[in-house]
Amino acid sequence: MRTYEMMFVLRPDLEEEQVLETKERLQKIIADFGGEFINAADGWGKKRLAYAIDDYVEGIYSLWYFKGKPETVDELDRIIKISENFLRHIIIRQDEK
């Protein structure tokens, strides 16, 4: 399994409960595809965006690390793209050391 870094920005108007549900859904996808959630740097919280995205000037930032197969990344990417809760996301494979 490879190690990945995933950063995503959620809509700032989401309730805390919606944010938690969205994050739990992503963790479930990682686990369902045989992956392993490593850790999250969720302390960033709500930050101002460099430019407006869909009329939002702020977003809720999260940075995650996880291990998984390429199929895990494909499914995460697919789910994030069809969800209205995400403004932006990126998933990067970490280099092996």
Curated annotation (Swiss-Prot):
Function: Binds together with bS18 to 16S ribosomal RNA.
MF term (GO), any: small ribosomal subunit rRNA binding
The organism's place on the tree of life at top rank: Bacteria
GO CC term, one of those recorded: ribosome
Positions of transmembrane segments: none
Signal peptide: none
Family: Belongs to the bacterial ribosomal protein bS6 family.
Entry keyword annotation includes Phosphoprotein: no
GO biological process assignments: translation
Gene3D superfamilies: 3.30.70.60
Name of the molecule in the record: Small ribosomal subunit protein bS6
UniProt keywords, alphabetically: Ribonucleoprotein, Ribosomal protein, RNA-binding, rRNA-binding
InterPro entries listed in its UniProt record: Ribosomal_bS6, Ribosomal_bS6_sf, Ribosomal_S6_plastid/chlpt, Transl_elong_EF1B/ribsomal_bS6
